[in-house]
Amino acid sequence: MNKILVDSPFSPDHQKCCPKLFTISAPAGVGKTTLVRMLEQEFSSAFAETISVTTRKPREGEVPGKDYHFVSHEEFQRLLDRQALLEWVFLFGECYGTSMLEIERIWSLGKHAVAVIDIQGALFIRSRMPSVSIFIAPPSQEELERRLASRGSEEGSQRKERLEHSLIELAAANQFDYVIINDDLNQAYRVLKSIFIAEEHRNIL
């Protein structure tokens, strides 16, 4: 009997013939970006994160072309006019969108695409094309409030508005394929990784 040696649960041949789109969504401050970076670090040959387009200004430490493609409102409108965006959303006064060309670019590399996007965007994509939707949730509303406060990126009325929006987002969790409670980062990552491995081996016939 021939032995099959498996160094990775992800098959390059399977990724090339059957590339998938994963969407990961969560209220602000829950840890979705950190979890995706952990996944990319361990399985860089299997996955790549899509780079969204946004009109908002870069935050401290963000790198244009790596974290986001930062554009003006006029440039964003031109993308809409050309129907270049698979999905887009207007959120807190700024626009965010995902380009189908960006997803296809990742697929052409023989990798699965991972889009870390707003909940509205994830549900819209799900209605238009096959995708695996994952929702990252906080362990409690109190913990969500604490994490939002610790971010320090919003103050006063902005933080209140962000919290109210986050509570609305939590109510949409049951519309996703998977829900992960991020109470412990390492445990949440183990669950996330198991989902990706299971989806890699899902029978699509």
Swiss-Prot record:
It comes from the Bacteria. InterPro entries: GK/Ca_channel_bsu (IPR008145), Guanylate_kin-like_dom (IPR008144), Guanylate_kinase (IPR017665), Guanylate_kinase_CS (IPR020590), P-loop_NTPase (IPR027417). One of its GO terms (cellular component) is cytosol. Pfam families: Guanylate_kin (PF00625). GO terms for molecular function: ATP binding; guanylate kinase activity. The keyword Hydrolase does not apply. Its EC number is 2.7.4.8. The keyword Kinase applies. CDD domains: GMPK (cd00071). This is Guanylate kinase. The lineage of its organism: Bacteria, Pseudomonadati, Chlamydiota, Chlamydiia, Chlamydiales. The gene is gmk.
